[in-house]
Structures are given as structure tokens and as C-alpha cells.
Amino acid sequence: MLQPKRTKYRKQFKGRIKGVAKGGFDLAFGEFGLKALEPNRVNAREIEAARRAITRYMKRAGRVWIRVFPDVPVTAKPTEVRMGKGKGSVEYWACKVKPGRMMFEIDGVSEEIAREALRLGSAKLSVKTRFVQRIAE
């Protein structure tokens, strides 16, 4: 699973996901893509599950680019533990996704295969997504 090799600080504030994506909203690498339509935190397990679903359906043909990276540490306290006594330990890594963010890109396969592969991948994610295609010039 994806996670940073090293970070400046072990834990982060929760924060809020406001506004729309300022960057990473266009197709940069592939012909087809999966774009987020709502804000949410997508964890590393979801990203990996989506990647596996996409590559399995494509039968290793073509190429997949993951355009998001889980760089936010999410902490949790153990169950049945009283409040206080400090912040919990890091449970998993997540990525804050804003609306309009391109999450996955695909190239080297037909539109039907790409559409179905990304549909299967989107089922693994906790955000609503849309299939996008490069406009032929």
C-alpha cells in the first residue's frame, strides 16, 4: 500500500476539505480517466483495491496512472479507551480529494474496456466519480 517514506511530523490535524481542486483536474498522461465529483478522504486501501480492480479487468494490457497519493496520517484511539491521554496512534494513511480531482488515468486500451475497468475501480472508492475522455483534436 502507498504511504510516505518519511514525514516531517508524525501526526496531523484533521482539517476540512473546502473548495474544488486547484490542480490535477485534467488528463495529463492517459486517454481516459476517473474524476472525483465530491470531497472526501480516500485511504490507501481504497486506492490499492481500485488499482487492482482496474488492472485485473484490463488483463495487464495498457497502462494505469495513479494521480493521488495518501499523505495524510489518520489517527485513532483503541476501542473502549477513555477520552484524553493524548492523541491516538496512526491507523492508516489517506488522501484528501477535492471535487474535480483526477484520480486514475488509463491508456492503451479501447473505450469499452477503459469504461468498465474504471467503473469497477470506482466501486472501491468512497467518492462519487465520473468517467472522462480526452477530446480528439
Curated annotation (Swiss-Prot):
SUPFAM superfamilies per UniProt: Ribosomal protein L16p/L10e (SSF54686)
Record-level GO cellular component terms: cytosolic large ribosomal subunit
GO molecular function: rRNA binding; structural constituent of ribosome; tRNA binding
Keyword field: Ribonucleoprotein, Ribosomal protein, RNA-binding, rRNA-binding, tRNA-binding
A Pfam family reported for this protein in Swiss-Prot or TrEMBL: Ribosomal_L16
Domain of life according to the entry: Bacteria
One Gene Ontology biological process: translation
InterPro entries documented for this protein: Ribosomal_uL16 (IPR047873), Ribosomal_uL16_bact-type (IPR000114), Ribosomal_uL16_CS (IPR020798), Ribosomal_uL16_dom (IPR016180), Ribosomal_uL16_sf (IPR036920)
Primary role: Binds 23S rRNA and is also seen to make contacts with the A and possibly P site tRNAs.
Entries under NCBIfam families matching the protein: rplP_bact (TIGR01164)
Subunit structure, as described in the record: Part of the 50S ribosomal subunit.
Similarity field: Belongs to the universal ribosomal protein uL16 family.
Identification of the protein by name: Large ribosomal subunit protein uL16
Species this protein is from: Allorhizobium ampelinum (strain ATCC BAA-846 / DSM 112012 / S4)
Name of the encoding gene: rplP
